[in-house]
From Swiss-Prot:
<dbReference type="InterPro" id="IPR016024">
    <property type="entry name" value="ARM-type_fold"/>
</dbReference>
<keyword id="KW-0067">ATP-binding</keyword>
<dbReference type="GO" id="GO:0071561">
    <property type="term" value="C:nucleus-vacuole junction"/>
</dbReference>
<feature type="repeat" description="WD 2">
    <location>
        <begin position="987"/>
        <end position="1026"/>
    </location>
</feature>
<feature type="binding site">
    <location>
        <position position="54"/>
    </location>
    <ligand>
        <name>ATP</name>
    </ligand>
</feature>
<keyword id="KW-0547">Nucleotide-binding</keyword>
<keyword id="KW-0967">Endosome</keyword>
<dbReference type="GO" id="GO:0010008">
    <property type="term" value="C:endosome membrane"/>
</dbReference>
<feature type="repeat" description="WD 1">
    <location>
        <begin position="940"/>
        <end position="979"/>
    </location>
</feature>
<dbReference type="InterPro" id="IPR001680">
    <property type="entry name" value="WD40_rpt"/>
</dbReference>
<dbReference type="Pfam" id="PF22956">
    <property type="entry name" value="VPS15-like_hel"/>
</dbReference>
<keyword id="KW-0418">Kinase</keyword>
<dbReference type="GO" id="GO:0016236">
    <property type="term" value="P:macroautophagy"/>
</dbReference>
<dbReference type="Pfam" id="PF00400">
    <property type="entry name" value="WD40"/>
</dbReference>
<feature type="lipid moiety-binding region" description="N-myristoyl glycine">
    <location>
        <position position="2"/>
    </location>
</feature>
<dbReference type="GO" id="GO:0005770">
    <property type="term" value="C:late endosome"/>
</dbReference>
<comment type="similarity">
    <text>Belongs to the protein kinase superfamily. Ser/Thr protein kinase family.</text>
</comment>
Amino acid sequence: MGAELSLLAPTAQPIALSVYVDFLSNIQYNKPLGTSRFLKTVKGLNDQGSIVVKVLVKPNSGLDLSEWVEKLEFLRLKLLDVPNVIPYNLVIDSVRAGYLIRPFQQRTLYERVSIQPYLEPIEKKWIAFQLIHAVMECHERGQYHGDIKSENVLLTSWDMVFLTDFAPFKPIYLPGNNPSQFSFYFDTSRRNVCYVAPERFLGEGTPTQYQEVDKLTSSMDIFSLGCTVAELFLEGSVLFTLPQLFKYKKGEYTPSLSGIVDNDLRNMIQEMIDLDPRKRISAHDCLRKHRGKVFPEYFYSFLYDYMLELSTPSDHSVGNWRFDECDRRIERIYNDMGMICDKLDVNLDLNIVHSFTEEPSQNVIPMTLRLPGVEPHIPQSSKTPYDSALIILNILLHSMRNTTHSSYRIKSCDLILMISEMLSDEQKLDRCLPYLVHLLNDPSIDVQAAALKYMTQLLLLVDYLTPVNVLIFPEYILPKLASFLSTTKGSYMRMIFATILPHLAKTALKFYEMAILLGSHVEKFELLKNFENLTIQLLIDPDSSAKISLLKNILPLASVFGKDKTNDIILSHMITYLNDPDENLRVAFIESILGLSIFVGITSLENYILPLLVQTLTDNSEIVVVNVLRSFAELNNLGLIKKRYKFDLIKVSSKLLLHPNSWIRLGTLRLLISVVKDLSLTDFYCLLYPLVRPFFEYEVTNFDWATLYPCIIKPIPRSIYTLSITWALKAEKTLFWQQVKLAKPDPFGSRNSTFLLNRNSKIGESGVVSNNQIPTSPEDIGWLGKLKASGFDEKDLWKIATLRDYIFRVARSRSNIPTQENNEVTMQQMGIYPRIVFFEKGSMYETEGFVTGSSMMANYRILVNSEYSPESLTKRKTVGGVNTNHTYSGANPYILKFLECIKFRHVLDDSEEFGPSIPSATVEEGHWKFEGVLVSHLTEHTGSITSLALSPDQQYFLTGDSKGIIRLWDVLQLERNGYATSHVTVSMSSSVKDIKFIENRNSFCAVTADGEIKIFRVEINSTSSSVRSNGSPHRHESISLLREHSLEGEHISDMKFIGPNLAVTTLSCKLILFDLRDMQIAEEIQNPVSHGFITSFDLDSSQSWLLIGTSKGILDFYDLRFELLVKSWKLKSTSYPIKHITVPPAGFTCNRKSERFALINGGTNDSVTIVFDVSKGQCSELYFTETVNLNTAIDNYEVLEVDNGEERTRTSVLATEVEDRSITSLTMLGSNQFLTATFDKRVILWDTGNKANSSALISKLDDFTSSFSSVQVRPHLMAINEKIVEKDPQDIGGPKRNMASANSSTFDLHSDIITGIAVIQKPLKMLILVDRAGVINIYK
């Protein structure tokens, strides 16, 4: 631009800079930056964020800048792909001014050098490396900066370098005798620092022709670069001022580099600032020559490229802030941590936690780090610090501050702790700790909890303090903790705080000791006072969980406070916990008292702890009593219980050998054995043995576990114990429970009362009361009668009397327990409120039409009394998928991702082709007055009828036979005319295996033995213009094929609809679930092949469990929530196939339980229906017919658990000569009735609610009738048995003569076994039976 510009520039600004900036569109003036006279610099704002605007105010004479606009645009394009460079991204030339615009960066290298925490040597080398690399990239592209200095080097918060403010427009050469030119163009910060190469200053004798070669060179930039690098390593000290540079040019001054300890680094800078431009090293040679010397090898091989990848925004990022970029960086570093350690040559001595090591849940500290690529380990400081980790730490800390989701901040805590292992103790406290403390203010309680835990673990790693950090606890950490605890109300956070507080107290004491060694004055009293206040807040916290957490970690805190303060502060509060209604708190107190007893000493143990524990033996919670007995044994093993207390302790606790709880008895026995070990033979036989002898069946000589355990006397049964507690609570006029005062307390200072005895009676040393010593009132005698009715032997009354002090106290304490409210923490209590989002559902693509035909009606074939092949039926293609739109308008990427992942379950209402939903017929509960009149006898089928299905509205029913023929029958026609022919016939490819209707729809599925699956729709059209002779309108039925699928090479054994899906089982032991929309396999379960092929299956109403029956008589129970085979069972002595499994409706009850039973036929050769309890794996009820001998058969119904690998099959079962006498068909009738068909062609209606109301509906026994009775054969098993008796002669030929058994026609009864049963509820209640001979009989 010429040196004359400095002469033309005005000394005072005539117009405010904001006016010049306002000239620019979309840019708003913010504030001035610097005081330069050449380029006025301001900070502005545009739609991308903050920017820097440099304004060149043109002199009045005018100035043409078009040439420089082109040059700067060319420079921008050349440097566009250089990562560490920020050229001007916009250059504007106007009439009044020129504008240079670039992005704003908060910090320059000049500022960063003087900001804490100060740069470590590795960070300085990293900045220098990037700066040299940036200059090298520019020079390789033929572009030169012209004004490299620390003010023109920008730094991010993670120390990424950007070289900016390129100045090719500034004068190349300056007069050596006019400093004002230098000050105008280059000394913009008024620091009087000169980094301009000395050859750019011209002396008086310099020829003018030399000035005409107006071109920057790389050596000029290298000199400025060397000065900038030197300033970086000299902690801000500059190499040259302008006068010093003039002297340096003349050889009269040598800059001092003595502050740089590294010889290689010092030599590198000297090579860069050499007075002779030709001897200066190039940027490329500098990086090459000093590789592995000044700059570590991993700068070149890994770190530079890796940091560029982390710093470069991804393509999908939008907006200026790019918060999602911080999430991406954290995730990337988290997954790459193992690789990063390897590339940075970090070798940590990991305290590895093996996979089989189970860490107790209460041990929050020490933590175990589990990061991808890194062995799980407990953090510990490295013997050799690895400062290279600071570079990764810087970008991690920046990303953590700006991440959008709490999960990434928690991952950042993991990474901070991992990286802190590589750092020095000073760096841990200066770099890592402040960020963890800052997270205590995070809105997420998970992040707060992580911050507490990781902060504690980090402080545990510190073994050395600097003088700067000696007051870190009293002045920084403790005030933060006090503020945090006072504002934290959540139960979870207070639990975590209570867990880490003892560890922090111990660490604070360690820091205090280190501070004393450094000669610093730290007040220990104030330090302990702060922890005392925090501890008291937790000890009196209304939330039991916080107190429990503190108790589990109380020993470190006690060691900090010392014996006296532990007694005064901790123990005085803890003993009140035994009166707390929360049994978990009482248990936690007892578990912690052992270690605390060792610390506080024998005096506190005898005066406070031991008497309280003895009183706790009568706690209403049995788990508390178990823990008290365990504590007594452990205290005795440690020698903390003196001899004089041991006998009293045994006398008090030995009565508990009569307690029904086995853990209490075992705890008492363990205490007894522990005490015996410390006694001499004399003390044992003279003092101890008389106390415990009444509680053993036999005389014992060895007091060890193997001898004593088998000899313990039989305890009080649980039922008697519970009834005794009720007796103690309700008895008013009682002598048994009447107490009398004692003159003096017991050795433990309590229990100054005992129970009333008969006159002249006295309790022995053992405390055992004999039966003749027990007084009873008339009311007591009544209660004793109740005990006898419950199986109590009156000769054992002494056991209750001996234990009545315990029973009485337990009864009283239970009656005083307040009703506890639900302690669950709701989301609203945590400050999380629901947000309602509505979804709109629409088809993603249109449903295709029919495959053939020009119209919808053209595709329906009416098949009347004729057979058609499957190919003649129409096919419809699948419906489309479901597209969902929601009303959420926010931009949170995690919520959006969650909403996108929501899958809506397909419902059949979305598919019109399955027909509209129709109401199902209502099942009438109660006794059925069955007449037994044969209404219709149908014989159209020429093959065995294998399946029977009644439509949901009971307008028609379907039958399928072994020849593959499906027939449709009109119920109304049968009811009116008594005879009928099938209305529609469909031919399948092979034997029809099963037919099932889709729930509440006129669509059904038929499966064949060869694996063919077809879904049909039944269309019923009533024509009012055409009427039958009886006046009812004619109905036309037609069947359309909707879906078909073939399982090649498979044979189907059973089939059921599960909501909108179809489940089929095959002989290859598979259960396959099809999606009805497209008949694609949605899920597949492979049952163990060794259990046999699947014969039947069913699910519960909530579809949470599945029961499968197999050909080997095995029942396989699946938990569908986890898709796991949980159990496998079979009956004890037989392995007959399971024929049929039905899960009854929700209203079915057995033993007042519901939704856990299945009705099973098979598994045995008996004519029986089993009610099986899947929750217990046992038979609950057995419904036997007359043909079964109950006395011999009942033992066969014990259920055994089967291993998944079991393949044994009873050969006797496979014998062909064994007659099959099992139930042939079963169907539910309402929720508490079911019908079964027996092998002898009879039909029985079983009433599970009132067993005696069961009846035989169809029977060949003309002069006999059935009666039903039930008997409890096992505690968990009831047998309901049919008994056939001869009818009363007066009833023969009477009104009941019209039963089916009384008709004499040959076709009244079935000649072959019945294969299907159905009950029509309307218009008349009728019974449909089909058999293996192809006959259909309908009765009313």
